[in-house]
């Protein structure tokens, strides 16, 4: 999240006729129940995303939340914290990929509420197995290798559950980087619809009401 704060964050000023109020752009989006994951997934980012999801649930436990994703992925444990929170809260969480959803970003995209998982036309989606790189004593390396295999199995199981693909196919496809277009991701079961315009999303929203 440091990358966000190192940038100039736009400020939005709202005037209701009696007074003005300034918001940073992310806080303003939060008012409309929009959460943006636009960076690598790490512990700090996961904490912020989870906090926003929990806050929006406390504001209205019935109204859906929109999670927009443009992420290269990142920490598995941080990503699973977001995944578990999405499932834990009461509101449905719709996911929208813009740009790319890779690795944990792809898993979070697929974790959206069924029939509420979207991607914009030129989005790129990529799935693969967890990356290792631990260095140390042989026994510690063995421990971490077994943990990576356990995580890989769990991530494959989640993708199987979310896509409807067989565990064997998911394991085969994630053996190496597996890139997909938005239409490919729809065919694979990672998303439900490719959105061309806001009108498409509004139509889908009306269907779910």
Curated annotation (Swiss-Prot):
Note one Pfam family from the annotation.
CLP_protease
- GO biological process: any one? protein quality control for misfolded or incompletely synthesized proteins
Annotated catalytic residues = 103, 128
Primary localisation category: cytoplasm
Assigned EC number: 3.4.21.92
Its recorded reaction(s) are: Hydrolysis of proteins to small peptides in the presence of ATP and magnesium. alpha-casein is the usual test substrate. In the absence of ATP, only oligopeptides shorter than five residues are hydrolyzed (such as succinyl-Leu-Tyr-|-NHMec, and Leu-Tyr-Leu-|-Tyr-Trp, in which cleavage of the -Tyr-|-Leu- and -Tyr-|-Trp bonds also occurs)
> Could you tell me where this protein is found in the cell?
Cytoplasm
Which of UniProt's keywords are assigned here?
Cytoplasm, Hydrolase, Protease, Serine protease
One GO MF annotation is: serine-type endopeptidase activity
State if Cytoplasm is listed as a keyword.
yes
Has UniProt tagged this entry with the keyword Hydrolase? yes
Q: Write down the top EC class of this protein.
A: hydrolase
A GO cellular component term found in this entry reads:
cytoplasm
Tell me which SUPFAM superfamilies the record gives: ClpP/crotonase (SSF52096)
Instruction: Spell out the NCBIfam families in the cross-references.
Output: clpP, PRK00277.1, PRK12553.1
- Protein family according to the UniProt entry: Belongs to the peptidase S14 family.
Q: What does this protein do?
A: Cleaves peptides in various proteins in a process that requires ATP hydrolysis. Has a chymotrypsin-like activity. Plays a major role in the degradation of misfolded proteins.
Q: How does it assemble?
A: Fourteen ClpP subunits assemble into 2 heptameric rings which stack back to back to give a disk-like structure with a central cavity, resembling the structure of eukaryotic proteasomes.
Any idea what this protein is called?
A: ATP-dependent Clp protease proteolytic subunit
Q: What species is this protein from? A: Lawsonia intracellularis (strain PHE/MN1-00)
């Amino acid at each position: 999240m440091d990358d966000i704060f190192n940038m100039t964050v736009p400020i939005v000023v709202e005037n209701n006729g009696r007074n003005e109020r300034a918001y940073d752009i992310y806080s303003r989006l939060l008012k409309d129940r929009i959460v943006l994951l636009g960076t690598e997934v790490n512990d700090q980012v996961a904490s912020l995303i989870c906090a926003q999801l929990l806050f929006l649930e406390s504001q209205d436990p019935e109204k859906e939340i929109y999670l927009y994703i443009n992420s290269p992925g990142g920490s598995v444990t941080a990503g699973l914290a977001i995944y578990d929170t999405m499932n834990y809260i009461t509101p449905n969480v719709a996911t929208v990929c813009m740009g790319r959803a890779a690795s944990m970003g792809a898993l979070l995209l697929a974790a959206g509420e069924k029939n509420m998982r979207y991607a914009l036309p030129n989005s790129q989606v990529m799935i693969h197995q967890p990356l290792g790189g631990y260095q140390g004593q042989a026994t510690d390396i063995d421990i971490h290798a077994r943990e990576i295999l356990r995580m890989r199995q769990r991530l494959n199981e989640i993708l199987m559950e979310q896509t409807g693909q067989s565990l064997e196919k998911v394991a085969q496809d994630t053996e190496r980087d597996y890139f997909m277009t938005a239409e490919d991701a729809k065919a694979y079961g990672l998303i439900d619809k490719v959105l061309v315009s806001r009108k498409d999303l509004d139509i889908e929203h009306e269907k779910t009401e």
